[in-house]
Design a protein with these regions (language model features):
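Acidic/polar loop-and-plug regions of large Gram-negative outer-membrane beta-barrel proteins
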Residues: 1-34, 47-78, 122-150, 158
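Outer-membrane beta-barrel signature, preferentially recognizing the C-terminal barrel domain
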Residues: 3-31, 152-156, 228-310, 342-347, ...
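Residue-level signature of outer-membrane beta-barrel architecture
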Residues: 33, 89-91, 166-169, 204, ...
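Repeated loop/turn-to-beta-strand initiation elements of outer-membrane beta-barrel proteins
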Residues: 38-41, 95, 172-176, 219-222, ...
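Transmembrane beta-barrel strands of outer-membrane/channel proteins
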Residues: 43-49, 102-108, 178-182, 222-228, ...
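Structural signature of Gram-negative outer-membrane beta-barrels, strongest in the C-terminal barrel
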Residues: 78, 97-109, 152-282, 310
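Conserved C-terminal beta-signal and adjacent last beta-strands/turns
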Residues: 100, 224, 260, 342-449
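Gram-negative outer-membrane beta-barrel transporters
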Residues: 272, 277-281, 293-379, 446-448
């Protein structure tokens, strides 16, 4: 069907019973110690404890504009622990300089989940522009676990050890880096109701990384790099497109990703920029006949430009643009082979400008323009959301209050009050449309103590 027109972003088409409540407690610490003048050791660690409770009812829009929905309730608890440590040593062998780094990391995750759905046939909610409120239906059609006491549904242990040496030639004008990294990913998934093990794997791999930097002058550098990494397999959703997935919660096999980049960097002190071409691949998943499975990979090849700095005193610029060729490759039976993956624009760009008003010391005005190209909403590439452009304006004033630096800010986002679909996403087959924010005015103040 056709993409529905975006509704008035200042309105609210959500059902009155819906809510999302999330709490996160996290902390991190890191320290370094110079063992000698050329050897440094470091260690860091952190944790995150999260709790989440949702009662959702996202509308589905038909070709005639009518909307329907079903109710989805879930609770989630996450516990994450991480630690990393390493050594960095610098020395020379003849005319060649070395910077050797060895490091190790470990990340442990335990996730508890429970969910419940109402009848997937759904209920009428009017239209996006004229929503109709309904009484919350019972969530007894598809249940996984106890919402008040969710069981462990996923555990993951990611460990890695890496060593790399950056060699310096020609008085530091040529830098060459070579490294190896061993990764081990151990993941298990469990049934949300019974707690029984449903799938998992324990896989390890050594992957390489290489890089070159040539400092053509004090301002211009040419660089190139290649790296591989082991990525965790995707987890099958429990529901996709309003239909239960028969292997929901199953974890797919890990994927070896590759990244290649070649670029040029200019740094003139006050002003600079980079221009690069790159190629990155990532796994692709598909839901077909209610089964989630791996379906080849997404190949992203593109050109990226970024600029930064103060080309004129009092006038600053920060921006960038990316042109992306995204294609699905190695798909099952050639389905959607060569198509663009869901929610991937061919062009994205933004530019931020700031100007210090000389007549009023401390006063700065700024503007930002953001543009995103069209995005397909289905893997067959038959329908897409239109491209969009947003203008933001702001002003800030820096002053001192009792010798304390204070900055006052005012900002107007989406100056033209455009209604637009900002992005497309979700699990395969879900095809979520994300509505952009309406015109929004904000005030803030900050102080440095």
């Amino acid at each position: 069907g056709d993409i529905p027109e975006p509704p008035d972003a200042s309105g609210n088409f959500a059902q009155p019973f819906t809510f999302s409540d999330e709490k996160q407690l996290f902390a991190a610490a890191r320290g370094e110690y110079d063992l000698t003048g050329s050897v440094t050791a470091w260690i860091g660690g952190g944790f995150r404890e999260g709790e989440e409770e949702n009662d959702l009812s996202n509308p589905r829009v038909a070709a005639d504009g009518s909307a329907s929905a079903f109710r989805f309730v879930n609770t989630r608890e996450d516990s994450v622990r991480s630690i990393d440590a390493g050594l960095r040593a610098e020395f020379e062998t003849g005319a060649i300089g070395h910077s050797v780094v060895t490091s190790g990391t470990f990340v442990d995750l335990e996730s508890k989940n429970a969910f419940a759905f109402s009848n997937f046939g759904g209920f009428s909610t009017g239209t996006l522009s004229n929503p109709v409120a309904v009484t919350a239906p019972a969530t007894d059609a598809f249940i996984g676990g106890d919402l008040a006491n969710p069981l462990v549904t996923e555990t993951s242990e990611n460990a890695s050890f890496a060593i790399a040496d950056t060699l310096s030639f020609a008085q530091g004008r040529l830098l060459a880096t070579a490294g190896l990294r061993y990764q081990n990913i151990k993941t298990q998934s469990f049934n949300a109701t019974s707690g029984d093990l449903t799938s998992g794997y324990d896989a390890g791999k050594v992957t390489p990384a290489f890089g070159l930097v040539w400092k053509a002058s004090s301002q211009i550098s040419l660089y190139g790099n290649y790296a591989e990494n082991l990525q965790p397999g995707a987890t099958a959703p429990n529901v996709s497109g309003g239909v239960p997935v028969t292997n929901g919660g199953e974890i797919l096999d890990p994927f070896t990703g590759e990244q290649v980049e070649v670029g040029l960097k200019y740094d003139g002190g006050d002003f600079g920029g980079t221009l690069s071409v790159f190629s990155v691949n990532r796994p692709n998943g598909i839901v077909e006949n209610q089964v989630f499975s791996a379906d080849g990979e997404q190949r992203n090849q593109g050109i990226e430009l970024s600029i930064f700095g103060e080309p004129i005193t009092g006038f600053r610029v920060l921006g960038g643009a990316t042109v992306l060729d995204n294609q699905l490759e190695k798909t099952q039976d050639g389905i959607n082979e060569g198509n663009t993956s869901i929610g991937t624009p061919e062009f994205q760009g933004n530019i931020n400008l700031e100007y210090d008003v000389a007549a009023i010391p401390g006063l700065t005005v700024d503007g930002r323009v953001v543009h995103t190209g069209k995005q397909f909403t289905d893997a067959a590439n038959t329908i897409a959301v239109e491209d969009w452009t947003r203008l933001d304006l702001g002003v800030r004033y820096a002053l001192e209050v009792n010798q304390t630096p204070v900055t006052l800010r005012a900002r107007l986002e989406n100056v033209t009050n455009n209604d637009y679909w900002a992005s497309v996403g979700g699990f395969p087959g879900a095809n979520y449309l994300i509505l952009g924010n309406p015109r929004t005015f904000s005030l803030s103040a900050s102080a440095d103590f």
